[in-house]
Amino acid sequence: MNAARAGWSLLLAAGIGLSLWQWREATESPQRHGGHTHLHDDSGKPARLHAWSPADAAQVVLATPGASLRLRRGAQGWVAAAGQTADGFDAEEFLALFSQARSDRALVPQPDQPYGLTPPQLRIEVLDASGAKLASLDVGELAPDGLGRYVQVPGEPEIRIVPNYQTRAPLAAMAIAAP
């Protein structure tokens, strides 16, 4: 009977020890977790990159190192700037998706890793009627899993991974291959 009691006591102590270890790991900084962290809002959803409403957007600017496309909201909907075309790009649909863009992963940049952000493959900017930036995002390469894409909010030190579908339409509008 003493051996059984000792076995249960040992099992209980091991369970408490593992629980304390998990708690300690969860409270450490992201650098201790391979350089990444998972970001969530109070409801448990991945944290939004920006807080704005698509109704406030008056301009969308897509820029690559070699070209740019500027769309303005007009009385008839979204119109590309003079001399530019946005065939197949639905700005209204994109803004509805982009305004909810979420990232549940942030990475501390590693100097030996390619992210496609220097320079970015694409910069997305959303402006309001007065020209103030509602959102800005640099878009880089596809992540190794093929499902996410490296992005960076200008001015933030960390790199984030967002689902690739969130950037597929603007990449296609700028004729950048988007799997």
Pin down the residues of each PLM region:
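A short-motif feature that recognizes glycine-rich, charge-decorated loops
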Residues: 1-179
